[in-house]
């Protein structure tokens, strides 16, 4: 088996393919017990009903992945099963899993796309299938090409009376007022502590509809009170998967709604559910907790088990990371809706995506799909826009600026898309030099300069563009720091590398902001996130250990021990206080390699399944909370707690997920190395039992 997996990876592109295998959603989906059980139940009901009617059940499984659904079909009594899987390493793994479960003679595995499958005697399929089971869906339901795949299958691979599992999908939309979500989409005016406006947003930025990319998040984890529901959930689209004529690419539905309460319709929350069988006995919902049909029953079940942990409301319902919910931003209305006011929700989809609009009446001209026209939503991520709008963060920076800048200050800004750096130019300094190597980001910043009539700014398209004569006049170097290429917060240590290269040109007296960055770790018990890395073992009675080995093997080659996750979406309980790992100083000794070692201690090692890691940026040498910008918890964590940790919603943190139980003493040795040549940080956590 090992050679087979390695050969598959080598044939298809080495490291990138190993990374794809290691980070694929196959294991995550297999951990979704509700999905598994409801697919299993729908297969049992569908096949039993066919047999009761005197018909055979010939099953086609498109995108079989691990082979789980095909094996369920055999167990449910299917007369034949054909499974197709185009991702070759996964297909090879499915072949071995099917054999390990003794079904190699009953399931025909076709290692190609369903659109390439042939039907007829001696071909991929001996006959057309009268049962189709598949899960071609993503958060947006149709984003992975479900419409085209179903249409092709109905035309070429399935009988006219085919029964599909799932039978039908329904898309729901809920209109909301949500300032938090809007802060990830729309830039705000930047003001100082006295309320004086420093930067106004150009109109072309304020009215831009933003990125067309789906914004998928765990809606159930939005902080309490962060949104105002303006409508009940509205069913806007239905997809009957067995009806070719209904699976069209382009549709517009207009739904008359009445506002439940007053507010601005800023966004639509979207999710979908699946009616798994034709009779409608089995329903699989992806709704957030407040709209989930089984929320109250599941909450009661949890409260009856006597757990002392305060589980967040959103974690009573089944967890999944492959099918989340999504946020769609609405074109802005200038006046709010009043309670009881009638309005029209416009829902659109093409072959791959959804979008929405609102109006006081039905529209004759359809709303086109959104795309960014201002550049900001191309140059910056949504979480970065959230950072730019973070009032507490901005206040700390601006208060510090007022302390350290003067009318003689010449400020070099080594961050990309830094409105704070631009704001410094409005605070009375002599000049601001903005490092902006990205052409799109530079044009975005130029729009702010022009709209706000900022005169004392010069752009540097590269570090080499800084002339020695001008470098000699610089009094302050400032960075947030932020670079669009950064995935983990400490990837922004690239700032130190830029600073190191410019040092020979800068005066010895230059003030460096931030002065240092400190990495911290927190041992935690994730409620659900650990499942993306947890071994499967058996799943619904089938042995999937071979899949564990496949993912484990390729993770060894491809994975960093720390990955980026927005931890506000994935609740966790702290099992100890915060541990300082390493501090990187930008004022001195940045060029020197650093190695730190230590141990994490937890009192309940059986609960430990992850380590959260983040960085704090210290604007000066004081390490005062008032001059520290943290990408970590909102409140310092000093000890274990049965209350979930509250995380900053505008950052991704680092996560190390554990696959083994630590020793009984509850200690995990760690080491962290900083390489100044690459501006990289390397982590090692020794999970072996001692």
UniProtKB/Swiss-Prot annotation:
Biological process per Gene Ontology, one example term: chromatin remodeling
Residues annotated as domain SAM-dependent MTase PRMT-type: 5-355, 364-690
Pfam families: PrmA (PF06325), PRMT_C (PF22528)
Keywords for this protein: Methyltransferase, Repeat, S-adenosyl-L-methionine, Transferase
Protein name per its UniProtKB record: Protein arginine N-methyltransferase 7
Main EC class the enzyme belongs to: transferase
Function comment: Essential arginine methyltransferase that can both catalyze the formation of omega-N monomethylarginine (MMA) and symmetrical dimethylarginine (sDMA). Specifically mediates the symmetrical dimethylation of arginine residues in the small nuclear ribonucleoproteins SmD1 and SmD3.
InterPro entries the record matches: Arg_MeTrfase, MeTrfase_PRMT7, PRMT_dom, SAM-dependent_MTases_sf
EC number: 2.1.1.-
Organism whose genome encodes this protein: Anopheles gambiae (African malaria mosquito)
GO MF assignments: histone methyltransferase activity; protein-arginine N-methyltransferase activity; protein-arginine omega-N symmetric methyltransferase activity
Family: Belongs to the class I-like SAM-binding methyltransferase superfamily. Protein arginine N-methyltransferase family. PRMT7 subfamily.
